[in-house]
Amino acid sequence: MSTDNKQSLPAITLAAIGVVYGDIGTSPLYTLRECLSGQFGFGVERDAVFGFLSLIFWLLIFVVSIKYLTFVMRADNAGEGGILTLMSLAGRNTSARTTSMLVIMGLIGGSFFYGEVVITPAISVMSAIEGLEIVAPQLDTWIVPLSIIVLTLLFMIQKHGTAMVGKLFAPIMLTWFLILAGLGLRSIIANQEVLYALNPMWAVHFFLEYKTVSFIALGAVVLSITGGEALYADMGHFGKFPIRLAWFTVVLPSLTLNYFGQGALLLKNPEAIKNPFFLLAPDWALIPLLIIAALATVIASQAVISGVFSLTRQAVRLGYLSPMRIIHTSEMESGQIYIPFVNWMLYVAVVIVIVSFEHSSNLAAAYGIAVTGTMVLTSILSTTVARQNWHWNKYFVALILIAFLCVDIPLFTANLDKLLSGGWLPLSLGTVMFIVMTTWKSERFRLLRRMHEHGNSLEAMIASLEKSPPVRVPGTAVYMSRAINVIPFALMHNLKHNKVLHERVILLTLRTEDAPYVHNVRRVQIEQLSPTFWRVVASYGWRETPNVEEVFHRCGLEGLSCRMMETSFFMSHESLILGKRPWYLRLRGKLYLLLQRNALRAPDQFEIPPNRVIELGTQVEI
């Protein structure tokens, strides 16, 4: 969805509220409770309440309003955002060594997202279901089972797409934010003293009074800004202006009113700390509030799941993850996809997390390390873009980076205190994903280099075949080639073993460009290499899925007629064996072999009819 679509600005803004702000919009369920629950050594005291409220408000202003919405969202790739997009932009005009460092940062940021995404659905849904403790305390043993049931249903409907229920997201989330604002305003009116916390000096006073403990407490404050990265990642769906408009007109005021309303309640009734969010509501409204909270957390979880699907597709298309089955669930919206393997792996991980941690307060101890780590990396990558791509003054860029890091690094460092109490979980998951992505990329490069290191010139081979042709058989043969100027392995092995060649040979390369989409005019490039050889290069963006049938259709429009069911597709199938390596490289090689065995086969990946495919095997030592 973008402003290019003929939709009104209010409609797009409403849709952005429904998708983009689910995570950060459900943070009031648990943030202030975790800040003042006593784990940091101070109770519900006036100075502590004012200090936390001031920190939360000014973090929302600085991190979300200024850093992400004003600065980072300027860095877009054809309207698209996200940490991998930022990585790609930052590396465009830098040296090879610097680019390598930026790529590593981007991959770490993407890996951190995988680590946190296991926690987000669990903590969001559990914190909503925990409202049962207020409504009916005897039902507290049902919190874990009900959370699992809700999330099971959510993961089960993914294969059907979210187009139908997605239409309900926006009105539900708008209702949610209005409820946040209403509950908070009602409490603030009863105790207006809490508005003094808008003064940033209360945050300064908080650090001066509580010293080291206040620094550690930042690990709880950061819960208020989790989901900030989603604003940038979802930029391509809604556009910059609608996302900014939604934040400043609806989301920020609602969050501020609710946090300060909880603070006003706690100043009057410190015992409300057991669940200040639900205790804001009158008794008659608790059950309706519980229902709308559950719906809001499901929507927040859906946004995160969709984000995982999008990030995975981007990583696959950029060559950082092995090919896997990607199902389009909407004929109208290319961004709506379903990846079965990712969906069920994530589901299993979320259920294990819920059963292991049992309460959202325990999960809060695991939340934040990966989020703040990504914030640090985003600051570095975005300021690199400002310097290298926008050519801003280096001293001005340095000041911006210092300002960002003065907030990001303390938040990240404070969250390291959570390492042993649960923070190891997202870090471990992120580390696994980083190893997987770097292994696939590096070993794939090693394999391709090994396969072509002794190859002859493509032009020389074609000239030789035209001069002394082998037996030619009727029809068209398509040889899939990973690189433009190399001889496809399948072609060499077909000549070696079968000693025949089709009357017409097409060397097809499917290429992923550094852009989300490629215009149809630039989709296919055709070059005739000889009277019987053609080279076809089809370009796709990383948000698009290659389709050979579409390529053939466009070839026909440009004069190279091809009929899918009358064409033979020759592909190479590599049987890999490990050569002599140091032990650590041998481990990486074994991981690559495992990934390779489970990768989606090329015919399925490019939607080629199986009965038209001929695979020629070859053994390659890596």
From Swiss-Prot:
Question: Which cysteines in this chain are paired by disulphide bridges?
Answer: none
Catalysed conversion reaction: K(+)(in) + H(+)(in) = K(+)(out) + H(+)(out)
What Pfam families does the database record attribute to this sequence?
A: K_trans, K_trans_C
* Topology of the protein relative to the lipid bilayer: Multi-pass membrane protein
Q: Where in the cell is it found?
A: Cell inner membrane
Q: What InterPro entries does this protein map onto?
A: K+_transporter, K_trans_C, K_trans_N, Kup
Assigned keywords, A-Z: Cell inner membrane, Cell membrane, Ion transport, Membrane, Potassium, Potassium transport, Symport, Transmembrane, Transmembrane helix, Transport
What role does it play? Answer: Responsible for the low-affinity transport of potassium into the cell. Likely operates as a K(+):H(+) symporter.
**Family affiliation:** Belongs to the HAK/KUP transporter (TC 2.A.72) family.
Official protein name in the record: Low affinity potassium transport system protein Kup
State the species of origin. Escherichia coli O157:H7 (strain EC4115 / EHEC)
